[in-house]
């Protein structure tokens, strides 16, 4: 007999990360690499923790720290790939990266899909992150 674990066993449940549908359906975001889409999902997950811990700047914007070495670990990639993936999210308008200098990690400000120009999900009929 095999040791099969079925999904209905709540004590064996695992944590998961939500991956927003709009990243795959909205024309604005379909060109993003899959790594960038997954990293954005990890950033959104970490945003919840930042919100709970009260990490907001003087304007009330939630920020987080995601050092490059952690991105490398999470995505199982090299340093340059991690940098490029973060940059890809920045160019897509999904995050703002603020350098702090003096050896401090960059602050990452996650943005909502609604903040990205040329993205009108109501007109396009594509889903929202809650779908």
Spell out what each predicted region is:
Residues 22, 100, 113-115:
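Generic structural motif
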Residues 16, 83-86, 118:
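Generic N-terminal initiation segments characterized by hydrophobic and/or small/turn-forming residues
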Residues 29, 34, 47-110:
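Winged helix-turn-helix DNA-binding recognition segment
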């Amino acid at each position: 007999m095999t040791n099969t674990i079925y999904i209905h066993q709540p004590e064996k449940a695992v944590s998961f990360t939500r991956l927003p549908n709009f990243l795959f359906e909205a024309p604005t975001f379909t060109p993003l690499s899959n790594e960038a889409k997954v990293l954005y999902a990890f950033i959104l997950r970490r945003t919840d923790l930042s919100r709970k811990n009260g990490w907001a700047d003087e304007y009330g914007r939630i920020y987080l720290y995601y050092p490059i070495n952690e991105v490398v670990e999470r995505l199982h990639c090299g340093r340059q790939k991690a940098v490029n993936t973060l940059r890809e999210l920045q160019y897509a308008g999904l995050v703002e990266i603020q350098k702090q200098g003096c050896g401090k990690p960059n602050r990452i400000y996650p943005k909502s899909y609604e903040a990205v120009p040329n993205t009108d999900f109501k007109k396009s009929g594509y889903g929202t992150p809650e779908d």
